[in-house]
C-alpha cells in the first residue's frame, strides 16, 4: 500500500517541489483540500480531494473541511495497536503517514491597518491546528511538518531512509510549538481588543540567535524576538556578531533617542536631528544639531573619554559628514534608520564596527512592554514612553526660566529619565555636558555630573529623575553656576529646596512626574 500524505497549507511556498518529490520519487498518494489541492492539480499531479475521500462536502463556507473521522482516524491510529487497525478496516479508513499543514495567516491579517473583528475571526484556523496536534501526538507513526523551511530536510530524510525516532520527536516538538504560538497570538489579540484584564501573561518568541555568551563569558545567552519587530527587524550591514552587551546598549540608545523622534527620511527642516552615545546602558553624550554630523559631534563632545568603546544611535539618515565623525574613533556599534552609500563606504574600513539599519517601521511595531525577570517570575510594566506635558509643569521660584532655559530644561528632562537612578543630567544649548548615574544618594550623582561639566556648567541647567530630599543638591548646583533646575518634586522638604533656589538666584521647575530607572 502506498504511503499517504495529507497536504493543506496556507503558505504555498515550496509546495509544488514537495508534492512532485512525494509523488514522483517517494511513491506517496496525496490527499488535499481547497487552494492546496487546486495548485497541485494545476501541475497535473494526482491528488484526492478531502471531500472525495471522506464522502462529506465542505460546509459552513469552508469552516468545516478536514474535521472528519476519516481524516483524524487515519492520523491518530497507532500502527502497533491491533484494535486501532481493526477500527480503520471496519470504517474503511486509510492510515495517513505524513501531515504537511501550516495555518491561516492570522498574524498577517491583524497586522493590516483597520482590520475588522470579523475578518480577524475568520482567519482563526480550526482544522489546521487539529490535524497538526493529532499528528504531533502520534509522531511515532506520523510525520508532521509545519514550515516550508523543513521540506528539503524532510525529502532528504525519506530518500536516505533516515526517518529516525529522534527526527519524529523533533518535528513533533516544532509542531506543538507552532500551534502554541498561534494560539497565544490569538489570545493576546483578543485580550487587546477587549477591556477585560488578562489573568495570565502569555508570550511566545522564536529564537533569533544563539549569542556567544551573556554579560560575561561564563554566562550562556540567547536572543528571542518577533520577526520584523524591534531589533529583530534590524539589518546588520557589517561587523562582528552582536553580543548580549551590544544589544542591551543598543536598546538603551534607542530608548533615549526616541525622545527626539525617529524617521527614515527627513522631509521637515525643523525635525530635531539627534545623536546619542551610550556606555554600559547609560547616556554619556546626547545632543541635537542642525545636521546629523553636527548632532553627532556635539554628542561626542559631551564626554569623549567615556564614548570610547560605546554605542552611537542617530535618529536620521547617516551621510558622509556624519560617517567622518565616527571614522577615527573606537565605537562598538552604530544604529540609524539609514546609511547612504558614501557613509557605508567610509565606515566599511572599520571591519569590526557593527552597523545596523533599523527602520522606523520596526520600531513602531515593537511591543510597548518592559519586562524584567525576578526569581520565579516576571515583572511587566508599560514603557516609560516619550511624553512631555509642559502644561503640568510648575515654576515654583521667584525667578522664571527664559524660553531658552525652558528648551534646555525640556532637553535635560528627556535625557535624565534614561540614566540609571539616582540620575542627574547637566545640559546647555541642547547638549549634555555632564551625566551622574547610579549613585546611592542624589547629591553623589549631582557631584559626578557637575564635575564632568566643569566650567561649562555656568549658565547650564540641571535635571533630576527624582525629588530632592534635602537642599544640598541645589547648593552644589549653585557652586557650579547652574541657572535652572528641573525635578519631579514631591519631597516633604520641597520648600527647603525652593527657598535655597530663591536665595541663590536659581529657577526651579517641578514636573509632578518621576522617572526612576533601576
From Swiss-Prot:
SUPFAM superfamilies in the cross-refs: Cytidine deaminase-like, Methylglyoxal synthase-like
UniProt keyword annotations, A-Z: Hydrolase, Multifunctional enzyme, Purine biosynthesis, Transferase
Coiled-coil spans in chain: none
GO cellular component: cytosol
InterPro entries tied to this protein: AICAR_Tfase_dup_dom_sf (IPR024051), Cytidine_deaminase-like (IPR016193), MGS-like_dom (IPR011607), MGS-like_dom_sf (IPR036914), PurH-like (IPR002695)
Pathway this chain belongs to: Purine metabolism; IMP biosynthesis via de novo pathway; 5-formamido-1-(5-phospho-D-ribosyl)imidazole-4-carboxamide from 5-amino-1-(5-phospho-D-ribosyl)imidazole-4-carboxamide (10-formyl THF route): step 1/1; Purine metabolism; IMP biosynthesis via de novo pathway; IMP from 5-formamido-1-(5-phospho-D-ribosyl)imidazole-4-carboxamide: step 1/1
Gene Ontology biological process: 'de novo' IMP biosynthetic process
GO molecular function, one term: IMP cyclohydrolase activity
EC annotation from Swiss-Prot or TrEMBL: 2.1.2.3, 3.5.4.10
Domain MGS-like: 1-146
Catalytic activity: (6R)-10-formyltetrahydrofolate + 5-amino-1-(5-phospho-beta-D-ribosyl)imidazole-4-carboxamide = 5-formamido-1-(5-phospho-D-ribosyl)imidazole-4-carboxamide + (6S)-5,6,7,8-tetrahydrofolate; IMP + H2O = 5-formamido-1-(5-phospho-D-ribosyl)imidazole-4-carboxamide
Disulfide bonds: none
Protein family according to the UniProt entry: Belongs to the PurH family.
PANTHER family: BIFUNCTIONAL PURINE BIOSYNTHESIS PROTEIN ATIC, BIFUNCTIONAL PURINE BIOSYNTHESIS PROTEIN PURH
Comment field on protein domains: The IMP cyclohydrolase activity resides in the N-terminal region.
Protein name from the UniProt record: Bifunctional purine biosynthesis protein PurH
UniProt organism field: Prochlorococcus marinus (strain NATL1A)
Gene: purH
